[in-house]
Amino acid sequence: MKLSVTFIALMLTMTLTQGFVLQAIDGRDNSGLDDLSEADSMEHQLQRRDCGRCPLGQYCDAEAGMCKPTLIM
């Protein structure tokens, strides 16, 4: 019993520490989406809504507001 409690405490500590280390190194936020990525996501969704659903083999050109064929070289 004592060993399992120690193991759980160790794993919890390692998980929390890893999250803080990642955030300190490159600014990641493991607690969910931050405001900037939510705004980017919403902007992306609005741009895609301009085109609607593009047919297979085409992509949404948000600037033009229409579907365009994918170029394959």
Swiss-Prot record:
Expressed by the venom duct. Its main location: secreted. One of its GO terms (molecular function) is toxin activity. Contains 2 disulfide bonds. It comes from the Eukaryota. Residues 1-19 form the signal peptide. It is found in: Secreted. Belongs to the conotoxin L superfamily. The cysteine framework is XIV (C-C-C-C). This is Conotoxin Cl14.8. The lineage of its organism: Eukaryota, Metazoa, Spiralia, Lophotrochozoa, Mollusca.
